[in-house]
Amino acid sequence: MIQTVLFVCTGNICRSPLAASLLERALKERGLEVAVTSAGTGAWDGAPASEGAYLVGLERGLDLSGHRARLLTRELVERADLILTMARHHRARVDELGGEGKVSVLGEYAGRGGDEVSDPFGGDLGVYRDTCQELESLTAAVADRLAAESKRGDQR
């Protein structure tokens, strides 16, 4: 059973912290206890969430004020049971760090094909809203999948 989910993007200041917060909420709504975290392939350790991600998060009832970016490390990859990336190049980096077999591009895992989640960094709030809406849909699908897998595991 999956105990820890790790989201990966580039800077760990936009997409992955939003996705982590959205999945945490979706899992809680489904009664699942799964640790959710995030990291970036090119993150500056300690950087706060971008202003756009922070503001759009607030609009959705998410508080990213305490978020601090983390660089993706082998240790984070080893500790995660499931790693979901925003793009294929992030997946390649996870593979390099030993994550083969437990990494997927988010859209693929959510059953939406191989579409990547585009980076809103530098865009206006409308771009961030579009990204957050996409992440909301994808993370709901992930939560549904994890809930179904958990239910199957309980029946064994």
Question: What is each PLM-predicted segment?
Answer:
Residues 82, 88-156:
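Phosphate-binding/catalytic loops
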Residues 17, 87-88:
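Alpha-helix N-cap/helix-start capping motif
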Residues 7, 84-85:
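Hydrophobic beta-strand core positions in alpha/beta domains
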Residues 1-79, 144-156:
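Conserved active-site segments centered on acidic
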